[in-house]
Amino acid sequence: MAISKALFASLLLSLLLLEQVQSIQTDQVTSNAISEAAYSYKKIDCGGACAARCRLSSRPRLCNRACGTCCARCNCVPPGTSGNTETCPCYASLTTHGNKRKCP
């Protein structure tokens, strides 16, 4: 009788231990999936996007430099050669010290 109680207690303890190990592994898999999703956020090609954005600019070097800075901070460049800033609110919100729009 004493052996069966000890066997039952050790079996119960083993099951609880296995449950804890499984829950820890599930948490690790979930956190790894979240961190992989954060790293899978791809950087855009700022050079190509800014070249397209600044192709009609009268000062293309200045435009490309400003656009590149904005793209590096926001990881987006609005489509087209001007306007369309609603597609990239971060790009539209950056300003100079004089409160002028920084991004072309």
Curated annotation (Swiss-Prot):
Keywords: Antimicrobial, Cell wall, Disulfide bond, Plant defense, Secreted, Signal. Six disulfide bonds may be present. Expressed in tubers, stems, flowers, shoot apex and leaves, but not in roots or stolons. Residues 1-23 form the signal peptide. Transmembrane segments: none annotated. One of its GO terms (biological process) is defense response. It is found in: Secreted, Cell wall. Residues 24-38 form a propeptide. The keyword Signal applies. Induction: Locally up-regulated by abscisic acid, wounding and infection with compatible fungus. Down-regulated by gibberellic acid or infection with virulent bacteria. No responses to ethylene or abiotic stresses. GO terms for cellular component: extracellular region. Belongs to the GASA family. Has an antimicrobial activity. Causes a rapid aggregation of both Gram-positive and Gram-negative bacteria, but the antimicrobial activity is not correlated with the capacity to aggregate bacteria. This is Snakin-2.
